[in-house]
Amino acid sequence: MSNSRQHQGHFARKRFGQNFLVDHGVIDSIVATIAPARGQRMVEIGPGLGALTEPLIARLATPETPLHAVELDRDLIARLKQRFGALLELHAGDALAFDFRSLAAPGDAPSLRIVGNLPYNISSPLLFHLMTFADVVVDQHFMLQNEVVERMVAEPGTKAFSRLSVMLQYRYVMDKLIDVPPESFQPPPKVDSAIVRMIPYAPHELPDVDPVLLGEIVTAAFSQRRKMLRNTLGDYRETIDFDALGFDLARRAEDVSVAEYVGVAQALAATRNAQ
């Protein structure tokens, strides 16, 4: 595979994190995993040159229910419009600022499927942005840097377990599905990639916790991950009775389960509400 940044007459732009998927075997596997069906509401983040876009459109899009796509590169937008016409509804702009709720069906039921080969340079911020729309999402299938996927699905007690693990596992059921080598892209990235499936928990399955407070606790815990929690969470000792929770502060952040972090955030909420 060539290391050239040019593919199909387009130069991949580093500032957009562009690495175009070109391996048709991998593309077929991804589409089979997504299993798109006619009439579904689906949005692709970063369609690029349309490697995934084309088979997705073939399986689900009609002029009445097009595939939606969010793309920042205006050169690519022009090419995609010319190629797919009314079957692709393009939204020009940054996915980090896009209101994905605007594409969901009216009502409370989840209706939106989200897919994409996400730019690796913004993957974590984008995943956190998408969390705010999880209540209208059926599922998400993303190509990401393998290291990020490993952190997303990591178990407590492992080095990969992180703030990202806790916050995403609180909101989604996640599975790593397919490993994708660098040579599947043009230009090849310097890292391995993987496909992850993310299915939001239904409202009745979610713990009753303020995600902002959960994020506050988890961020503090992982702020110095090699230190014990009695140091990183020490400022909360005056407001949270850790002993009553059965929460051992003589551990590191990576050794605490998602459920335990939720319990601490709930205790913090109860204390602050009582003040």
Curated annotation (Swiss-Prot):
Q: What is catalysed by this protein? A: adenosine(1518)/adenosine(1519) in 16S rRNA + 4 S-adenosyl-L-methionine = N(6)-dimethyladenosine(1518)/N(6)-dimethyladenosine(1519) in 16S rRNA + 4 S-adenosyl-L-homocysteine + 4 H(+)
Which EC number(s) does the record attach to this protein? 2.1.1.182
Keyword field: Cytoplasm, Methyltransferase, RNA-binding, rRNA processing, S-adenosyl-L-methionine, Transferase
Q: Where in the cell is it found?
A: Cytoplasm
What is a single molecular function from GO for this protein?
16S rRNA (adenine(1518)-N(6)/adenine(1519)-N(6))-dimethyltransferase activity
Q: What class of enzyme is it?
A: transferase
Binding-site residues, S-adenosyl-L-methionine: N19, L21, G46, E71, D94, N117
Q: What is its main location?
A: cytoplasm
Source organism, top-level taxon: Bacteria
What are the annotated GO cellular component locations?
A: cytosol
Question: Which PANTHER family does the record match to this protein?
Answer: DIMETHYLADENOSINE TRANSFERASE, DIMETHYLADENOSINE TRANSFERASE-RELATED
The text of the family note is: Belongs to the class I-like SAM-binding methyltransferase superfamily. rRNA adenine N(6)-methyltransferase family. RsmA subfamily.
Record's function text: Specifically dimethylates two adjacent adenosines (A1518 and A1519) in the loop of a conserved hairpin near the 3'-end of 16S rRNA in the 30S particle. May play a critical role in biogenesis of 30S subunits.
Q: What is this protein called?
A: Ribosomal RNA small subunit methyltransferase A
Q: Which organism is it from?
A: Burkholderia multivorans (strain ATCC 17616 / 249)
| Name of encoding gene | rsmA
